[in-house]
């Protein structure tokens, strides 16, 4: 994996209805960032979808921070796994 300065590796955790939203494309459009998906998995738990995506967020520091702040509003958990400062 080749990261540029400022890129962040982010794990997104989805559950229930949040797994059906087009979050990645929405964040990319609204915050002018590129999001690359490097891993994804979805399972059913008690009949409800539960999933994880490992992504790379690329763009300006401010745009990435704004995108991360908005993720919680979509009932999705974001964890910064690596920050290529």
Model regions and ranges:
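Long, contiguous binding/interaction regions
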Residues: 1-52, 56-85
């Amino acid at each position: 994996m080749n990261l540029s300065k400022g890129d962040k590796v982010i794990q997104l955790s989805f559950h229930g209805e949040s797994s059906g939203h087009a979050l990645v494309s929405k964040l990319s459009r609204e915050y002018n960032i590129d999001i690359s998906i490097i891993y994804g998995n979805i399972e059913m738990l008690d009949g409800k979808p539960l999933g994880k995506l490992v992504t790379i967020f690329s763009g300006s520091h401010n745009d990435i921070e704004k995108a991360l702040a908005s993720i919680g509003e979509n009932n999705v958990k974001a964890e910064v796994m690596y920050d290529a400062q």
